[in-house]
From Swiss-Prot:
GO biological process terms, semicolon-separated: DNA-templated transcription termination; transcription antitermination
Protein name: Transcription antitermination protein NusB
Molecular function as annotated in GO: RNA binding
Family: Belongs to the NusB family.
Reported function: Involved in transcription antitermination. Required for transcription of ribosomal RNA (rRNA) genes. Binds specifically to the boxA antiterminator sequence of the ribosomal RNA (rrn) operons.
A Gene Ontology term for the protein's cellular component: cytosol
SUPFAM superfamilies (alphabetical): NusB-like
InterPro entries tied to this protein: NusB-like_sf (IPR035926), NusB_fam (IPR011605), NusB_RsmB_TIM44 (IPR006027)
Lineage of producing organism: Bacteria, Pseudomonadati, Pseudomonadota, Gammaproteobacteria, Enterobacterales
Entry keywords, A to Z: RNA-binding, Transcription, Transcription antitermination, Transcription regulation
Length: 144
């Protein structure tokens, strides 16, 4: 599977999660909109679906995992930063085929494109702390 297709799936997931947080529209309607109306060229649609539905279904669990590592209240996080952290944490904890370094680097790249100017430093710090907490194994995967 091409890396670009997963990267594009992460971008589409971020856009869908942002829309979901801001609009509170139906999850399936947002997914349908992204798939039919957005530029999904080079996007791995099945990975987009896995991430989007997975992050939403695990949102509370992912938030609980990040809260102890935030330097501010969860409510003070911007929608982009919050969504990027959720995507990365989903990949760290639920996607065994993704090395933890890839999940963290992809999150940093996403927030550099879509987030505030210095958000990548914040995201990197939070994810690094969480990865260490989750006991990173020697084969670059998180031990569950």
């Amino acid at each position: 599977m091409k890396a670009i297709s997963r990267r594009r799936a992460r971008e589409c997931t971020l856009q869908a999660l942002y829309s979901w947080q801001v609009s509170k529209n139906d999850v399936k309607e947002i997914e349908r909109y992204v798939v039919t109306e957005q530029d999904i060229q080079d996007c791995n649609i099945s990975y987009f679906h896995e991430l989007y539905i997975g992050v939403i279904s695990c949102a509370e669990e992912l938030d609980k995992l990040m809260i102890p590592h935030l330097s501010r209240n969860l409510e003070k996080l911007g929608y982009i930063e919050h969504s990027v952290l959720r995507i990365a944490l989903f990949e760290l904890t639920k996607c065994n085929d993704i090395p933890y370094k890839v999940a963290i680097n992809e999150a940093i790249e996403l927030v550099k494109i879509f987030g505030a100017e210095k958000s990548h430093k914040f995201i990197n710090g939070v994810l690094d702390k969480i990865a260490n907490q989750l006991c990173v194994s020697t084969n670059n995967h998180i031990i569950k």
